């Protein structure tokens, strides 16, 4: 199956299914000499892993990553980095009743038509379980970007109808929702408790921000940085929309409001989300992701079986009532991977480019 590799100079290839023996990633193109440890990777994996609160799937996976190659005495060698996470808490029997049915709004129907065979256990390859390897690979990218003064951070900005204003980065890591507003957490918990009683699911919005990105990243025309970020972020399970900067709000803006004016002291706004003409401007890069409600719920839904007969489908098993709750580390990982790839591509072509114009920040 193609489409398992992302990137051009810094590439990430993943393999594995939700209920298979393990998940695997091959990370290629990382420069040699980068200090890296299991703890660097495990930190973000622990932020993403299931079973950490009552508001996520109760599947218990330690998600302990193993580094198989490409690292020697705590430093990258420049060779391919092999990563592995073993699956330890599969309950495949939960899915035996739906092996010949198609769950509404799930990938069952489309995988069946594309390949003629599918792993029905937990969604197989289409499961968000695969994103554990992206997070592990993304931790390598984040470590490299940090050596260049670049940080990538994210937070939940909306859960269902509840909008979450940004207050502090410190709050993000202090609750299960990655909420930047601690005062919103009780409301989010109450909403999720009621959602569970209703046997339903809900969507979410995640915001991810990269700071310290130098001007010049992005390869027009078809590899514009915003196009590449949209590609990377849209590849995450359940993501149905991506905005860069003001995004769809720019439809209602006038040019006098939307344009990010420049002064010697810096840009006056950042409606462009840190990208102009497909190239980073030096401002913070800001992206927003819309994640749909998970389709795996216990409320019956109409569908068909493999023979086309009408059926009612009830999905058993352990599922996230809101996949957005664990999506923040995944979004950070994909943005970091995309930025590292473009940073290396920029170096390859433009390392000797020098201009006298100062780099502007945001006032």
Swiss-Prot record:
Gene3D superfamilies: Chorismate synthase AroC. One of its GO terms (molecular function) is chorismate synthase activity. Pathway: Metabolic intermediate biosynthesis; chorismate biosynthesis; chorismate from D-erythrose 4-phosphate and phosphoenolpyruvate: step 7/7. It comes from the Bacteria. NADP(+) binds at residues 48, 54. Its cofactor is FMNH2. InterPro entries: Chorismate_synth, Chorismate_synth_AroC_sf, Chorismate_synthase_CS. GO terms for cellular component: cytosol. Its EC number is 4.2.3.5. Keywords: Amino-acid biosynthesis, Aromatic amino acid biosynthesis, FAD, Flavoprotein, FMN, Lyase, NADP. It catalyses: 5-O-(1-carboxyvinyl)-3-phosphoshikimate = chorismate + phosphate. Reduced FMN (FMNH(2)). CDD domains: Chorismate_synthase. FMN binds at residues 125-127, 237-238, 277, 292-296, 318. One of its GO terms (biological process) is chorismate biosynthetic process. Disulfide bonds: none annotated. Homotetramer. This reaction introduces a second double bond into the aromatic ring system. Belongs to the chorismate synthase family. NCBIfam families: aroC, PRK05382.1. This is Chorismate synthase. It comes from Pseudomonas putida (strain ATCC 47054 / DSM 6125 / CFBP 8728 / NCIMB 11950 / KT2440). The lineage of its organism: Bacteria, Pseudomonadati, Pseudomonadota, Gammaproteobacteria, Pseudomonadales.
């Amino acid at each position: 199956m193609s489409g398992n590799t992302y990137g051009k100079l810094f590439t990430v290839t993943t393999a594995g299914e939700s209920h298979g023996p393990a998940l695997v990633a091959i990370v290629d193109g990382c420069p040699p000499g980068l200090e890296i440890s299991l703890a660097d990777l495990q930190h973000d994996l622990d932020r993403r892993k299931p079973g950490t609160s009552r508001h996520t799937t109760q599947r218990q996976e330690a998600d302990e990553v193993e580094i198989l190659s490409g690292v020697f005495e705590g430093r990258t060698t420049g060779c391919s980095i092999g990563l592995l996470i073993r699956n330890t808490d599969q309950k495949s029997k939960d899915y035996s009743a739906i092996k010949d049915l198609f769950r509404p709004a799930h990938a069952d129907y489309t995988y069946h038509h594309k390949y003629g065979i599918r792993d029905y256990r937990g969604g197989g390859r289409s499961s968000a379980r695969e994103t554990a390897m992206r997070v592990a690979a993304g931790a390598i990218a984040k470590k490299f970007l940090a050596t260049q003064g670049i940080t990538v951070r994210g937070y939940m900005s909306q859960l269902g109808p509840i909008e979450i204003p940004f207050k502090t980065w410190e709050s993000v890591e202090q609750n299960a929702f990655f909420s930047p507003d601690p005062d919103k957490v009780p409301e989010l918990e109450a909403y999720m408790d009621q959602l569970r009683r209703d046997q339903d699911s809900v969507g979410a919005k995640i915001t991810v921000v990269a700071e310290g990105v130098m001007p010049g990243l992005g390869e027009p025309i078809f590899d514009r940085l915003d196009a590449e970020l949209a590609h990377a972020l849209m590849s995450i399970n359940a993501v149905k929309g991506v905005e860069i900067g003001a995004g769809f709000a720019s439809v209602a803006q006038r040019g006098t409001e939307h344009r990010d004016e420049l002064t010697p002291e810096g840009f006056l706004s950042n409606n462009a989300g840190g990208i102009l003409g497909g190239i980073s401007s030096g401002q913070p890069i800001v992206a927003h992701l819309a994640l749909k409600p998970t389709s795996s719920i216990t409320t019956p839904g109409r569908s068909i079986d493999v023979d086309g007969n009408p059926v009612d489908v009830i999905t058993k098993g352990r599922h996230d009532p809101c996949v957005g709750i664990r999506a923040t580390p995944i979004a950070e990982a994909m943005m970091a991977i995309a930025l590292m790839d473009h940073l290396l591509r920029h170096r390859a072509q433009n390392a000797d480019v020098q201009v006298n114009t100062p780099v502007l920040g945001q006032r």
